[in-house]
Amino acid sequence: MTLKEAMKSIKPASQALRRQAERRWDQVAKPLGSLGVLEEDIIRIAAASGSLAVSLHPRAIVVMCGDNGIVKEGVTQTGQEVTAIVAGNMAQGNSCVCLMARQAGADVIPVDVGMACRDAVPGVVNRKVAYGTKDFLEAPAMT
């Protein structure tokens, strides 16, 4: 199947299902709209999937890892070298977020989007756009 064929096969979201999902959430014992964006997203997923029984499986927590140049001003508890250590711990399943994710049945995916380290961290997805930000007291942090 080509991309064009795949795109043509996508049907518009069902407005009838959207209204049903909204009514369903309005009947839950909670203030109307109190779940904010989460509630809106579940309603949109129901309308797009064609089912009120929304399933969010598999679950994943994507952690974007990066370093800030302002660290050199001494405003943090640790230096930038700790970011790579924490990201590596996440990749091994040894971090607080990993413990919570296991309880929720979610995977943790650490992604290097701007860690200051030069070497790849095993198990961390490399999508680096820069080696950390600049110190914003000296220059724009990101350009």
Regions found by a protein language model. Give the residues of each.
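N-terminal loops that bind phosphate or other acidic moieties
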Residues: 1-143
